[in-house]
Swiss-Prot record:
Heme binds at residue 434. GO terms for molecular function: heme binding; iron ion binding; monooxygenase activity; oxidoreductase activity, acting on paired donors, with incorporation or reduction of molecular oxygen. Keywords: Endoplasmic reticulum, Heme, Iron, Membrane, Metal-binding, Microsome, Monooxygenase, Oxidoreductase, Signal. The keyword rRNA-binding does not apply. PROSITE patterns: CYTOCHROME_P450 (PS00086). This is Cytochrome P450 2C70. It is a peripheral membrane protein. Its EC number is 1.14.14.-. Residues 1-27 form the signal peptide. It comes from Mus musculus. It is an enzyme of class 1 (oxidoreductase). Its cofactor is heme. Belongs to the cytochrome P450 family.
Amino acid sequence: MALFIFLGIWLSCFLFLFLWNQHRGRGKLPPGPTPLPIVGNILQVDVKNISKSMGMLAKKYGPVFTVYLGMKPTVVLHGYKAMKEALIDQGDEFSDKTDSSLLSRTSQGLGIVFSNGETWKQTRRFSLMVLRSMGMGKKTIEDRIQEEILYMLDALRKTNGSPCDPSFLLACVPCNVISTVIFQHRFDYNDQTFQDFMENFHRKIEILASPWSQLCSAYPILYYLPGIHNRFLKDVTQQKKFILEEINRHQKSLDLSNPQDFIDYFLIKMEKEKHNQKSEFTMDNLVVSIGDLFGAGTETTSSTVKYGLLLLLKYPEVTAKIQEEIAHVIGRHRRPTMQDRNHMPYTDAVLHEIQRYIDFVPIPSPRKTTQDVEFRGYHIPKGTSVMACLTSVLNDDKEFPNPEKFDPGHFLDEKGNFKKSDYFVAFSAGRRACIGEGLARMEMFLILTNILQHFTLKPLVKPEDIDTKPVQTGLLHVPPPFELCFIPV
């Protein structure tokens, strides 16, 4: 009996201290639902569709509110104005990344995506410098993309118009493009090592998009229990092994005066700073940075184009207009180039609408404040997690009337010219916007226009029967599996 009394008193004290602490915190943080001990507000959040849950809470608490995903507060930014004020106007104060997600834990504070402070500044600055020197954003990188697209077109022709899943081939293009930048060589599509790497990469994305991954981020203790996160950790180990083998080959042939790719540049930087014990340029940082570049340069492009093909099957009238514009601007025999995009407003609008509509990353990995922040009259302590709902911006019904409808007109003016929108935040915003945005834009345009120049897309079912809803709606909106026929024209 005494034990039960003791436990009852202990639990009562715990609840009192928890609620008192939350009350104190609520005096500083934005408003939000009252959290329960330990579980916080997780029972009010659908981990299969977090953005929808946040939208419902925003209707009650406003565009800036606080939720507890577990025992720690997260400030949520909902809508364009709140996101712009935080991530752009006060970008320096909201520029760190949290370390609770599955991917951030395996990065160990290194690389380009999940590092913070001086590590992030130096690694990102160096990586951008190297990428630019290797032709990123210039004709040089466009030539690499064009070369890889030829391999893709050849592989599509070999399907002979029979039904096929386009996932692998669409992923090969951006993966091989970034491979030439990092490793100085591409992989044959039949290379088993390459296929294993691609399968490994795709499986990691599926795990990251799963509800279990979201729960692990809220309750890190789950990382120590059985679950699919252990499969993720094995895949990360295999990926590191693959990358280290490439690095070892580079070390044997390295010419300090003539770097050929990203690894060479990084190894030379390591050599220059080998006597600096505080150098950010280490072997571990190189491995993680390469993984980050593959992530930034592959998944967004391949999934967006794949989802785009599904939407073009669903809306054949849109496909016909793109092909009409291709015929008018480019013709049948000249290859599309990036210069053509300025003369193809409808195609450009469709590409933007695909990204807006699919909302591939509805809520990017949370950031955290770099210092105590005064924001909209609230006090947000240093290290507080901050979540930006991109869905709320991409689906703003004032900027995009009928946002639930796929309509390229969202990015066209009354004269049919392409219309830019500040609300287009498919690559996030501020200092932590996707480093691969420029490359992804080039690849999407060139892949899609080349496919539609050379093939007619034939669905296996009637367009009205095609379901475009994502199969997963957690961290990522993953397109449903589908097949189609590529009929040569």
